[in-house]
Structures are given as C-alpha cells and as structure tokens.
Amino acid sequence: MSGTVSGRSVYDVAVVGGGNLGLWTAYRLARRSGLRVAVCERGWAGAGATIRSAGVVRQQGGSETAAKLGKLSRELYLKLGERLGLDSGFRDTGYYIVAETERERESFLRLVEVRREAGVENEWVGVEEGRRRFPELNWERFLGATYTPDDGYVHPPVAARNATFAVHLEETVDLFEMCEVREISERAGGYRLRTSRGDVEAERVVDAGGPRGAREVAALVGLDVPVHAVRHEIVTFPKLGAGMRHPFPLFFNVGKGYYVRPEERGALVGMSNALDEADPSGLYQIAFDWDYYERVRPDWEDAFPALRGLPVSRAWAASIDYTPDHLPIIDEPREGFYVLAAGGHGMMWGPALGEKMADLVLDGAARDLPREDIELGRFGREKDPDRVEDMIALPFPKR
Ligand SMILES: Cc1cc2nc3c(=O)[nH]c(=O)nc-3n(C[C@H](O)[C@H](O)[C@H](O)COP(=O)(O)OP(=O)(O)OC[C@H]3O[C@@H](n4cnc5c(N)ncnc54)[C@H](O)[C@@H]3O)c2cc1C
C-alpha cells in the first residue's frame, strides 16, 4: 500500500505501532468508546516481534499483576475468536514450571498463593505426582513444578490475523500500513504526527512501538523509555520420538532459560542466553547462535528425552523487548502521550495490556493494577528492596 493517509486525518487517538499491543489497544478503545483511532504501522500489522514469537500464554506469572494480565489475556483471545467466528488460535495444553533448585521450589510455592489470589487455578505438583501425570518429563531432575491446566499458547500468525481483522472491522479505526511515524509535535489540543504517508493529528498518542520502536517513538517527544531489544531464539522439530504422546503439556525451566511446547505434530523450544546483551542493530532478525544451541541442547534432551537427536525443521532468532523489571509499562508520562510496553510478554499479556491502556485513556487509570507495577516513573527511583520483580521470565539482560 502507498499514498497518503486516506479519509479523515484528525483522530481522537493515534496508536503508533500495529503489533499485538497496538492492535489490541485500538480494538478495545473502539469497542468501548467508539473513539476515532488511527493505527500507524511502518510495516505490516503484526509482523514485528508478534509473528516471530512463540506465543506462550501463561497465567502463572511471577507477581499478582503478571498473573492477572495472563488470565485476562487468555479470556480476551477466546472471546475474540468467538466474536469473529474464527478459531482463537489458543491451545490450552496445561503448563508446568519446573523447579530445579531448593531456592526455586521455595519461591514457586509462594507464587502458587499469589496466583490463586489473582483468580488463577494453580497448584504445586510433587515429583511422584508429576511422574504419574507427565511421565515423558525426566522428574529425576526436578523437585516439583507449579501447574495450571488452562495455560497454553496462541499460534502467533493466528493471533496477529485475528487482532488485525478485529481492528479492520471497526468502523471508527483506520489501520495504515507502511506508515512510519517520523516526527511528533505538540499542537493546541493534541499532537501532530509526521508520517511517511502524510500528517495525522490526534488529541492523544499511544506509543506501542515494541522492541524496535517504543524507545525511539518516545524519544520523538523527548521521553526516555527503557524498552530494549535482545536476542531470543526458537527451534522447531517436525515430530517427537517414537511413542510419545501429542500434544504434551508445556514446560518451562526458568533457571536454564528454555521452554518447550507442542508445534503441529512436533515441538518448539524457545531459549535465551543469559549472557546476551541488548542488541542495538534496530533489526528484528538477529543471527542464530548455534554454539549456544548446542550447549543447551543436552539439557533439554535430558529433561525431555522425546526430543533426543531429532532433526530441526526451523530455527530463528529475533528481537524480544524487555524492561528492567520484566513488568509492563502502561502510563501517561505526558498529558495525552501514553506508553505501552510488554516487558517481553506481549503475547501472554497483549490483549490485557490493550484493555488496560483503554482504561487509562478512557477512565484515567488502569483498573485493578497497582500503579507502582506499571508506571514509567518506577525506573527512575531508588530501588525498593521489598518490591518484587517478575522472576518467571527469561534471563533478560540487567540493563
Ligand atoms: C522469538 C520470540 C519469542 C517470543 N515468545 C513469546 C511468548 O512465547 N510469549 C510472550 O508473551 N511473548 C513472547 N515474545 C515477546 C512478544 O513477541 C512481544 O512482547 C510482543 O510481540 C510485543 O508486541 P508489540 O506490539 O509491543 O511489538 P511488535 O509486535 O514488535 O509491534 C510493534 C510495531 O510497531 C511498529 N513501529 C515501530 N516504530 C514505528 C514507527 N516509528 N512508526 C510506525 N510503526 C512503528 C513496528 O513495525 C512493529 O510492527 C517473543 C518474542 C520473540 C522475538
């Protein structure tokens, strides 16, 4: 698509970025208020981190906020599928987060209570019970696991399709692809966005630029937003070893930084190297680190022998977003200018983040979440030693 922004060029809200976060924000704003919304996406909707992801959706967060966001997202994915008359793309396989050390066991046991408080069905599964329920996992390695039966994953291309389709059906939303936002200036009553397809005026702007845009878009209005990008890697295997059940439940070895989920008749493994640092290239595609893959492979083959010695069908490495505490940013740091970022969990939290951003725009506050977990200002303050970071996250860089 080319040419100028068509139709009206004056909006109530301009969303910068048409990934999972920007699309869900536009969709929820339109459904709830009928506001006129423009989504400016410099490429194709959903084609940033969103379609490159593994799509894991877990309600087993590492804090109450994380658990609430996971629960709400799961519900919203399912509802959208129903509304569109299409499959939601969500598969509830059940999900084990395994504890390999005593320290993990203790904190995971505490988290079971936190998640239950947030309304998530969650239990501790001991080794004997684990062997009975999920015999394919090598429980010799573990001290137990937390488990939620209706966690799972969403197939990322379907999630992107549905969110794009939902936005496209809303009469008050215009989705502009190949529309890069290059400058943002304040004007009376709002903002003017200079884009590659002409000017857009809006009373309010939502920065949903993702790993490769949130920081840069905020900088256009002089704000410093600590959203960075780092490599995350995926491999898929076309099938499992002979006699293995399929689909099998997801599992996550947080300490080792990898997780395994079903993919078609085989499996997908996602992994992050704790030694990788923020990637400044600006690219979504990053070189795959085969040395790291070979170093970690024996670990997951030992934990889940169904994958032992299998050929790979696909392998890719891409930019994942992260924030310093792995929690999201949902804030209005300047009047009428909003920042939305997923802290690397934009598939499991994307729909809920869109809903919470709609709360903030329409009602002035994101309902049901503590401000200190989501505001931008938390990063500039002295660290409160009692404040919990989300420990159920990949080993993202510290800076
Ligand atoms: C390999 C991998 C695996 C992952 N697995 C999971 C997972 O299992 N579960 C999970 O929850 N999360 C996962 N993630 C993270 C998840 O994909 C992201 O958190 C999520 O997609 C972020 O959504 P977003 O909308 O913020 O970003 P994006 O999808 O990147 O969308 C941002 C959009 O903004 C656009 N943009 C940027 N700047 C501008 C500009 N100036 N003008 C116009 N448009 C602009 C970009 O083109 C892009 O399309 C994974 C990520 C990767 C890379």
Residue ranges and their predicted role:
Residues R8-V10, D87-A99, L111, E123-V127, ...:
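Helix-loop-beta segment of a Rossmann-like dinucleotide-binding subdomain
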Residues A30-T50:
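Glycine-rich FAD pyrophosphate-binding loop
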Residues A54-Q59, T93-I97, L220-P247, R295-D302:
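Central beta-strand plus flanking loop segment that forms part of the substrate or channel wall
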Residues A54-R133, G257-Y259, W300:
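Dinucleotide-binding Rossmann-like beta1-alpha1 core, especially the glycine-rich loop
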Residues Y147-E203, R212:
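Helical element adjacent to the flavin cofactor pocket in flavoenzyme catalytic cores
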Residues D207-G222:
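Flavin (primarily FAD) binding-site architecture
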Residues D224-P226, L240-E335:
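Active-site lid/adjacent beta-loop-alpha segment flanking the redox-cofactor pocket in flavoenzymes
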Residues P298-R399:
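C-terminal catalytic lobe of FAD-dependent flavoproteins
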